[in-house]
Amino acid sequence: QFNWHICGQEKIIDFLQSAILNDRVAHGYLFVGPANLGKYAVAKEFIGSILCQGQPGPMPCGECFHCRQFKNGLHPDVYIVERIIDDKTGKLKKDIAIDQIRDLKSRLQQATFLNSYKIAIIPEAQYFNKNTANALLKILEEPTNKTVIILIADDANKLPQTIISRCQVLKFLPVAAKKINDYLMGLDGFSGFDGSEAKLLARLSQGKPGRAISFLQNRQLKEKYLGDINNFFKLTKADFSARFKTIEEIIDWHKDDTVNIKQINNLFDNWQSILRDILLVKSENEPLVANINFFEAINKNKELFSFNKIQAILAGINQARTYLKQNINTKSVLENLIINL
């Protein structure tokens, strides 16, 4: 009865679809798990199915008025709350603003425009401060009829327990490489795509379907991945002068990412991925290596990395992510990290 195009997460999908069929849709949901596991994709399919009026047939039908409005981002009863750009800095604000939650509360209290559910989705729920969290808690504690709020976060520990307790928590897990491979092979419209590339992307995704799909849809992203890994090996063998030169190359390579730190975090993802593979090779677990296209380089350079050094670099990357969230200059963050490689 459903038409959801999702890779993996079968238990979560069954749970949500059952809630729709049995008229047990909750007021609050928390989708939690690392990026690229399909949290936002599942949320969209869930919302689309709740709103769909194209009966009989699978939901969402994609053709009824509600489906068309939602697909085009025009449904008046669906609200997306995201961090906004700070006019002074030109960068995303550190937190979701209290005024945004107050505005959401006002909208949810109004009558529905299309005699449907009123739905709010907050894709970066980890960016609540104390005031916004308290304001949202009041909405969750006193939900209006036929209202659904979906929070999405990479880590439930970043949310107040009071918020978590008011939501049905659904934990998204990594997806098997074979399942991702099969999903990619079933996609249409990608010329020159074959089984060997699907296998490579499935391995590179490390259980994250969204990462594999992004590589497939965006060739530039794949080129950046290749550049990031090559730069990593280059940096580990370079002197300080060469390292600073490479920093400039990385900044130039990611020059379009000065406002959105997402791509710099992708750089860190790629470095963590190769470090994980070095650990696997050093531990004689070669079949588990994700970056199979860099296996020769991994094997050649593995002795440059002790287990302690790998752990130290991983800790440094996590610290760098924290600095980026605090809006510290990207170049300074990279310099601090790379000097200690």
Give the residues covered by each predicted segment.
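Clamp-loader machinery-focused feature within the broader ASCE/P-loop NTPase space
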Residues: 1-131, 300
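Charged, glycine-rich active-site and insertion segments that engage polyanionic ligands
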Residues: 1-49, 57, 69, 146-147, ...
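Secondary-structure boundary motif
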Residues: 110-113, 142, 189
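Structural recognition of the conserved hydrophobic beta-strand(s) that form the central parallel beta-sheet
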Residues: 120-123, 147-153
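Catalytic P-loop NTPase motifs of RecA-like helicase/translocase cores
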Residues: 128-129, 143, 158-159
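Conserved strand-to-helix beginnings and helix N-cap segments that scaffold or border functional pockets
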Residues: 130-134, 261
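Conserved catalytic/switch belt of AAA+ P-loop NTPases
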Residues: 134-151
